[in-house]
Design a protein with these regions (language model features):
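N-terminal helix-turn-helix
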Residues: 2-98, 102, 261, 265-269, ...
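Short, solvent-exposed recognition segments
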Residues: 2-11, 140-215
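Amphipathic alpha-helical regulatory segments at dimerization interfaces
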Residues: 34, 51, 102-114, 120, ...
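Short amphipathic alpha-helical signal-transduction/dimerization elements
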Residues: 36, 160, 164, 168, ...
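Amphipathic alpha-helical effector-binding/dimerization core
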Residues: 78-178
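Extended hydrophobic
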Residues: 190-262, 279
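Signal-transducing coiled-coil/dimerization helices and immediately adjacent hinge/linker segments
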Residues: 272-291
Length: 291
């Protein structure tokens, strides 16, 4: 090797390698997430670009690639971009892992009719709980997960706490370590509080009622356990605090338990869709409310 080549090689070796940027697939999903959080009538390229940290030109190219695939559409008049009906059809098909939503839907309908309150079905997804289904009652409430598909860190809200408390110990500890910085964002939650609540839920068999995060709201949830006693979902009631006093709470818990116990034996214990590891689920969400 001559001296000039050697100097070039030494210089190349000494130069720190830059970390690769996000792939086109990652950028596309970032744009899809931004669209999902946009106003109902859609979003503009400028706002989407700001939300995802990409140039307007890059976002424009991604949007038109997504339009070509049929998952995004652009309004001819407003020129706003939004997720298409085809996208939601795909999401609906994928949003029923192991037939869990189909299995639990009758229970949600019965509970909503019996209680007159909003009932949620939550399932675990990595470090989060995801709202898989809702049966809405007559009272206007706010929830941690919002609508179907909404996410919240495991440990925040009654439904996600009911799931977290009945996970295997090693998995539970990993989730607690990862989520403690996230739950602190709610002001009243820290690791001591979280661990105390988990132990309380394990002793009582349910999570409730007023988290203290939102005045005037309350909730209660029970885990849906598989045949090994591990939580795969939670049934949760969200309502006004005045409707979940000491006199009514035992009845609500009992109705939730009956439905959860009826669902549990029907769950396939070998279904890998319900045993996904937590690794890699590091996206932080910010929501507020009950359930």
């Amino acid at each position: 090797m001559n001296a000039a080549v050697k100097r070039d090689a030494d210089t190349a070796d000494a130069t720190p390698r830059q970390a690769p940027g996000p792939s086109m697939l990652e950028r596309a999903f970032a744009v899809i997430r931004a669209l999902s959080e946009a106003q109902p009538d859609g979003g503009r390229v400028t706002r989407i670009a700001k939300a995802v940290g990409l140039t307007q030109g890059t976002v424009h190219r991604i949007l038109h690639a997504l339009i070509a695939e049929g998952v995004v559409e652009q309004d001819e008049n407003s020129k706003l971009y939004r997720l298409s009906v085809d996208f939601f059809a795909l999401a609906a098909q994928a949003g029923n892992p192991s037939g869990m939503r189909t299995l639990c839907r009758p229970a949600l309908l019965r509970l909503c009719a019996s209680l007159g309150d909003t009932v949620f079905l939550l399932v675990k997804s990595g470090f989060d709980a995801v709202c898989l289904d809702i049966c809405e009652g007559p009272f206007t409430i706010r929830s941690f997960t919002g609508d179907v598909g909404g996410r919240v860190a495991l440990g925040v809200g009654q439904g996600s706490l009911a799931i977290l408390a009945f996970l295997p110990e090693a998995e539970r500890e990993e989730i607690i370590r990862f989520n403690v910085p996230r739950v602190r964002g709610y002001g009243v939650l820290d690791e001591v509080y979280l661990r105390t609540e988990i132990e309380r839920v394990r002793q009582l068999g349910y999570a409730g009622r007023n988290s203290g995060v939102l005045d005037g709201m309350a909730g209660v949830a029970v885990p849906v356990l598989d045949r090994t006693g591990v939580a795969v979902a939670a049934l949760s009631v969200g309502t006004l605090a005045a409707r979940l006093g000491d006199d009514r709470l035992p009845m609500v818990v009992e109705l939730l338990r009956r439905q959860a116990e009826a669902i549990g034996p029907q769950i396939n214990p070998f279904d890998i869709a319900l045993r996904r590891p937590v690794g890699g689920m590091a996206r932080v969400m910010s929501t507020d409310g009950v359930n």
